[in-house]
Every structure is written in C-alpha cells, then in structure tokens.
C-alpha cells in the first residue's frame, strides 16, 4: 500500500477531511520510521471498523489499557502494510472467522494522543482505519488487549462511547 496514494484517494472521497489528511501527509514527510511502534513523537497504527453484514451492529472492544470502548486495531509489525496489519488485528482481537474486507481503500483517519504506559511515553497514534464486515451472530472472543469484545446495536453505540472518532465511524456507514 502506497500511503501517499491512499491519502490522495481518501481526499477525493472525503474532501471535508482535508485537515486530518494534511496532518498525516506532514507527518509522513517529516518522519522516517512512521510505522515503527517505538517511533516518537508518534507512529501509524492500523484499525478496523467491523459492522455486521446487515449493518445493524458494530464490534467494539473495551480496551484493557485505555479503559474505554473503541474500534479494534493496533501496531503495524515490521514488513506489514497497514491493510495487512488491519487484517491481523481484526482476527487476533475478535477471533471472528467470518470477516471480510469491504473496501481496500482507507475508510477513516484519526490522530490522537495515546497515554504513557510502562516505558513508553505519551505519543501520537496516526490511525488508518479500514472497513470490514462479519456475521453479527458470530460470537467474538476477548484478547489480551481487551476486557471485553462485543457486538453493539448501532442505535445503542452512544451508551458505550462518546469518542467523536468512533461516532464518526458509525456515521460513515
């Protein structure tokens, strides 16, 4: 995946998100090891928005370290593209076997502060998010990254999170 080309395609699809795209592009220009999980002041992460096939439910995890409900995702391993990392994270963190990719293009972008944990100081996550679907009746499993992983009815999403970037994911589709 050529990230610059993917950002250009994303800009065409979501012209109202120019500010976040500009920040991503500036980060890519100014830094070398953008996918190294130890890179500071931040690094790119791969996330997945998983909705049920009938689009009535979304899959969220209660993140162990953050203590809040968010989409699944994580760090990009050496040699992986963001999309490959998204596939791996989706499988590892949900255990779902019915996963399918809806679109190879970027579905959403987000930039946020990640708190200091252990030896890693506070840093910035540049999330590249992809859209997946799965069978909403398939039972997900927890992973070491989560306290819980569960399907949530879309109309109840705000009972679990008030995070604007998660709400935006749901509003996109």
Please name every model-derived segment:
Residues 1-12:
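Generic N-terminal amphipathic, Lys/Arg-enriched alpha-helix
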Residues 11-47:
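Acidic, metal-coordinating catalytic segment for phosphate/diphosphate chemistry
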Residues 31, 40, 72, 110, ...:
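Glycine-rich, flexible loop/turn motifs
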Residues 36-71:
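N-terminal strand-loop-strand
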Residues 60-88:
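Aromatic- and glycine-enriched beta-alpha-beta binding-site module
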Residues 77-165:
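Unchanged
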Residues 167-169:
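Cytochrome P450 catalytic domain signature, combining two hallmark sequence patches
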Residues 171-173:
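Compositionally biased, intrinsically disordered linkers/stalks adjacent to structured regions
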């Amino acid at each position: 995946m050529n990230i610059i080309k993917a950002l250009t395609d994303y800009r065409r699809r979501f012209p109202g998100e120019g500010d976040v795209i500009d920040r991503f592009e500036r980060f890519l220009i100014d830094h070398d090891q953008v996918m190294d999980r130890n890179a500071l002041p931040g690094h790119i992460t791969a996330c997945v928005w998983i909705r049920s096939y009938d689009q009535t439910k979304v899959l969220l995890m209660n993140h162990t370290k953050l203590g809040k409900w968010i989409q699944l995702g994580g760090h990009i391993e050496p040699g992986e593209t963001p999309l490959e990392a998204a596939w791996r994270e989706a499988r590892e963190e949900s255990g779902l076997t019915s996963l399918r990719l809806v679109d190879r293009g970027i579905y959403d972008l987000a930039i946020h502060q990640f708190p200091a944990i252990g030896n890693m100081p506070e840093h910035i996550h540049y999330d590249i998010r992809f859209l997946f679907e799965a069978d909403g009746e398939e039972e997900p499993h927890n992973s070491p990254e989560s306290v819980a992983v569960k399907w949530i009815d879309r109309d109840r999403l705000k009972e679990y999170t008030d995070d604007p970037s998660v709400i935006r994911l749901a509003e996109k589709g």
